[in-house]
């Protein structure tokens, strides 16, 4: 079966104005992403501040994006929680709204073992009957989907990809050696490692920085696919990524999306915006990047 997408998927930020979801800004941002060639949009993930969105807001944001995109690119809904039953409910709602696939994070806080992970993911997948992207991000969950577990899960007809945010190429190669990549896609969850990830045969990236530079980030993948050496092309992007590392995601990227006109620079507690001085430095680096001066 064809992969959900090849190239750049965007982990969409949620714009706020006066602490409410700004649907006009959301529409502008999605238009910007579509106009600049992204291949997928991931809604209600980490970058979306999903823990501080209400269930109603999550559904409304997803519905808004699905209607606007109108089948032009793949829509993946973040529906994973540390509660299997609630994950099923959220996934069924996403399916009813028209999502193309769901992304499921590993359970956090009430951590399980690898047997529990298999049961958790397979129960959701078999109940919902929608393509599933596994989300492995141990830096946030303190839980890893071991390569053997990925292999087991890859045999489920609905589990079709993994977002690998380990930044560990030994892990990547172990997983890659165990799966049939014609049927199971490997997506990076780290913008800073995409050059090597692509060189090692990865199918794409679920990206944070593409919220602000979708065209440039997709062009990088396209150049690699055409056989070009993209190391030099990545250098200015790498410098922008260094500037983005000033704080945890999505705090810095929302400074850039706000700068681009997609909502106010607002986050919901416990997240706070960058200090003014840090935001100015980041925006200055971004403007240098856009001007070709990095």
Swiss-Prot record:
UniProt GO cellular component terms: cytosol
A Pfam family per the record: DHDPS
Sequence positions that bind pyruvate: 47, 206
Catalysed conversion reaction: L-aspartate 4-semialdehyde + pyruvate = (2S,4S)-4-hydroxy-2,3,4,5-tetrahydrodipicolinate + H2O + H(+)
PROSITE patterns given in the database record: DHDPS_2
Gene Ontology MF, one: 4-hydroxy-tetrahydrodipicolinate synthase activity
Intracellular or extracellular location(s): Cytoplasm
Active site location: 135 (proton donor/acceptor), 163 (schiff-base intermediate with substrate)
Keywords: Amino-acid biosynthesis, Cytoplasm, Diaminopimelate biosynthesis, Lyase, Lysine biosynthesis, Schiff base
Chief location category: cytoplasm
Entry EC number(s): 4.3.3.7
GO biological process, any: lysine biosynthetic process via diaminopimelate
Residues marked Part of a proton relay during catalysis (site): 46, 109
Pathway(s) the chain acts in: Amino-acid biosynthesis; L-lysine biosynthesis via DAP pathway; (S)-tetrahydrodipicolinate from L-aspartate: step 3/4
Transmembrane listed as a keyword: no
Cross-referenced InterPro entries: Aldolase_TIM (IPR013785), DapA (IPR005263), DapA-like (IPR002220), Schiff_base-form_aldolases_AS (IPR020625)
Enzyme class: lyase
PANTHER family: 4-HYDROXY-2-OXOGLUTARATE ALDOLASE, MITOCHONDRIAL, DIHYDRODIPICOLINATE SYNTHASE
Function field: Catalyzes the condensation of (S)-aspartate-beta-semialdehyde [(S)-ASA] and pyruvate to 4-hydroxy-tetrahydrodipicolinate (HTPA).
Family as reported in the entry's similarity comment: Belongs to the DapA family.
Binding partners and assembly: Homodimer.
Protein name, as recorded: 4-hydroxy-tetrahydrodipicolinate synthase
Species assigned in the record: Staphylococcus haemolyticus (strain JCSC1435)
Gene this chain is encoded by: dapA
């Amino acid at each position: 079966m064809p992969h959900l997408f090849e190239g750049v998927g965007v982990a969409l930020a949620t714009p706020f104005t006066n602490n409410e979801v700004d649907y006009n800004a959301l529409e502008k941002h999605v238009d910007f992403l579509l106009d600049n060639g992204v291949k997928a949009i991931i809604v209600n993930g980490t970058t979306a501040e999903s823990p501080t969105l209400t269930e109603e807001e999550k559904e409304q944001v997803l519905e808004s994006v699905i209607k606007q995109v109108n089948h032009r690119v793949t829509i993946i809904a973040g529906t994973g929680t540390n509660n299997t039953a609630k994950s099923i409910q959220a996934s069924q709602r996403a399916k009813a709204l028209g999502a193309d696939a769901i992304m499921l994070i590993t359970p956090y806080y009430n951590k399980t073992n690898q047997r529990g992970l298999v049961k958790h993911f397979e129960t959701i997948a078999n109940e919902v009957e929608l393509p599933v992207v596994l989300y492995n991000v141990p830096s946030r969950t303190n839980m890893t989907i071991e390569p053997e577990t990925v292999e087991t899960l890859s045999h489920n007809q609905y589990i079709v990809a993994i977002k690998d945010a380990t930044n560990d190429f030994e892990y990547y190669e172990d997983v890659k050696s165990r799966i049939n990549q014609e049927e199971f896609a490997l997506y990076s969850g780290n913008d800073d490692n995409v050059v090597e990830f692509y060189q090692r045969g990865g199918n794409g990236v679920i990206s944070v920085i593409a919220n602000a530079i979708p065209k440039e980030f997709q062009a990088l993948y396209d150049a690699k696919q055409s056989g070009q050496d993209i190391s030099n092309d990545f250098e200015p992007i790498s410098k922008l990524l260094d500037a983005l590392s000033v704080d945890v995601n999505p705090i810095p990227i929302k400074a850039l999306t706000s700068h681009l006109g997609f909502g106010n620079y607002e986050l919901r507690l416990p997240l706070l915006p960058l200090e003014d001085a840090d935001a100015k430095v980041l925006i200055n680096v971004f403007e240098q990047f856009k001007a070709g001066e990095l």
